[in-house]
């Protein structure tokens, strides 16, 4: 409606592709090659932002030389996208000056998912599309508070605020704040955890709001691990993983709890309880507090705000955010980093250059590698998954919503 140009790159012709100015129907697993091919065109035609590159990046010469291999013809061969469309997409993205990249789990849930995202960062850095309105590399998270969960340290490498567990200074700070000796080693990722159980490196699995019996790859392998481990589940519904649980803690849904949600633009917003908790359901934080007390770590919180205020003391990016400040801002929330209570928050990151030592972004040479699931000339067919608008992941929640289930009651296969 506003005349903005849209480029869609997706193996599946999603509804958004119908209104896109350019639709790049790439082969699954070729995102890195597409990014490199676009950079090849951008450099060849002098469309890069030379001033931004000079001030705010390192590694440009290596990258410039590296992507020479990814000519439009070579990129077409790898991705299946006509070279004319690749060139047009590169010109459109680089010449607009306020170009915004949005990506979702379609490029992250691969063996090369990290490279996929870094290749998009290369595009943004080389065209100066960082640190200004209408630009950036923006993840569309899987659901409303994935950002908030990551902010709080629900990652195998991080404490709250993305402070690294293996940083001695960070470890010392949290040990002092929490009064306990902490493990300096990185934890297991989701895909590492199942093999670790089978190798007797993990004995207990505490699952909150997940359904790995269905969502994790190699179902038989996962079920074997779940049968072997002591499994604790904390969720609002029973699901396929429940049959492996030794203990189940009934939790509360969003409308039954107080607290904050943080969205993909780092906006911390208040959530207020509007429904009474039923039966034996309890807030997640209350259940965890009871467990901590029972295993010998005494702690007491009266409200979730108490926990938030403790978090502020150890997390610089949240230090200036309070419940009162969120509400005072017309309930529009506050965007971190917000280091002090008189700080307004940060609507746009990287305004003065990337948030990295020296204010420069690192350009990476990323080689496209064929997917291990690639087909062969005899059977040139690829099976891939696609999001259903009406359902979320394993349908633990959406399958219990009558209107949603009525609209999309079954799975289907599309061929093209």
Predicted regions and their residues:
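Conserved thiamine diphosphate
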Residues: 1, 156-157, 398
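Glycine-rich active-site loops that engage anionic ligands at enzyme catalytic sites
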Residues: 161
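Long, compositionally biased stretches
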Residues: 329-415
């Amino acid at each position: 409606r506003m005349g903005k140009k849209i480029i869609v790159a997706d193996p599946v012709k999603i509804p958004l592709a119908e209104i896109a100015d350019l639709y790049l129907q790439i082969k699954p697993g070729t995102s890195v090659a597409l990014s490199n091919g676009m950079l090849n065109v951008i450099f060849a035609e002098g469309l890069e932002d030379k001033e931004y590159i000079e001030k705010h990046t390192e590694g440009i010469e290596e990258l410039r030389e590296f992507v020479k291999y990814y000519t439009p013809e070579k990129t077409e061969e790898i991705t299946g996208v006509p070279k004319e469309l690749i060139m047009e997409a590169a010109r459109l993205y680089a010449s607009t000056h306020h170009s915004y990249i949005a990506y979702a789990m379609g490029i992250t849930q691969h063996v090369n998912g990290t490279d996929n995202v870094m290749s998009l960062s290369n595009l943004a850095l080389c065209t100066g599309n960082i640190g200004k309105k209408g630009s950036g590399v923006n993840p569309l998270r899987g659901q409303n508070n994935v950002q908030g969960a990551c902010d709080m340290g629900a990652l195998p490498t991080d404490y709250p605020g993305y402070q690294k567990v293996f940083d001695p200074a960070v470890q010392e700070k949290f040990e002092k704040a929490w009064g306990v000796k902490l493990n300096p080693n990185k934890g297991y990722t989701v895909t590492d955890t199942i093999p670790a159980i089978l190798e007797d490196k993990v004995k207990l699995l505490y699952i909150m709001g997940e359904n790995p019996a269905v969502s994790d790859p190699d179902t038989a392998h996962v079920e074997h691990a779940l049968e072997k481990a002591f499994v604790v589940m904390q969720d609002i519904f029973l699901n396929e993983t429940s049959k492996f649980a030794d203990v189940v803690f009934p939790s509360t849904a969003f409308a039954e709890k107080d607290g904050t949600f943080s969205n993909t633009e780092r906006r911390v917003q208040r959530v207020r309880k509007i429904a009474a908790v039923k039966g034996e359901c309890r807030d997640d934080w209350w259940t965890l507090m009871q467990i901590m007390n029972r295993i010998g770590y005494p702690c007491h919180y009266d409200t979730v705000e108490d926990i938030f205020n403790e978090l502020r003391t150890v997390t610089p990016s949240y230090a200036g955010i309070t419940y009162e400040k969120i509400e005072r801002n017309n309930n529009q929330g506050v965007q971190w980093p917000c280091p002090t209570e008189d700080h307004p928050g940060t609507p746009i990151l990287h305004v003065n250059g990337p948030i990295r030592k020296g204010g420069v972004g690192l350009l990476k040479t990323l080689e496209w590698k064929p997917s291990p699931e690639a087909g062969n000339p005899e059977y040139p067919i690829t099976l891939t998954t696609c999001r259903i608008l009406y359902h979320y992941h394993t349908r633990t929640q959406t399958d219990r919503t009558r209107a949603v289930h009525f609209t999309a009651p079954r799975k289907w296969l599309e061929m093209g």
